[in-house]
Amino acid sequence: VYNPLDYARAPLELYLKRYARRGVKGLLLGMNPGPYGMAQTGVPFGEVALVRDWLGLEAPVARPANEHPKRPIEGFACTRSEVSGARLWGLARERCPTPGAFFEQVFVWNY
């Protein structure tokens, strides 16, 4: 079991500092970190390309202590795409001119 809150804390902290705020109208909750999303980037629904290129976040990600060979943690070097993250952040990018405009209304978190 991976806990990206432990090994991917640096990008998660950037995400929280930049985008978490009071007074949003909606909260979108994920129920587990995807293997090619939050497990790689520390960001909820963290599809690598969209986290890096649209949200403007990138930071070092460590390897978990008990890394599984079939689910390696590559951080922002991961070339696989998280489908749910691509859909969520892709929709946000289509609807909002900037990430800041999106996060004025909604926050995304993983339970």
Positions of PLM-derived features:
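A polyanion-binding, active-site-adjacent surface
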Residues: 1-111
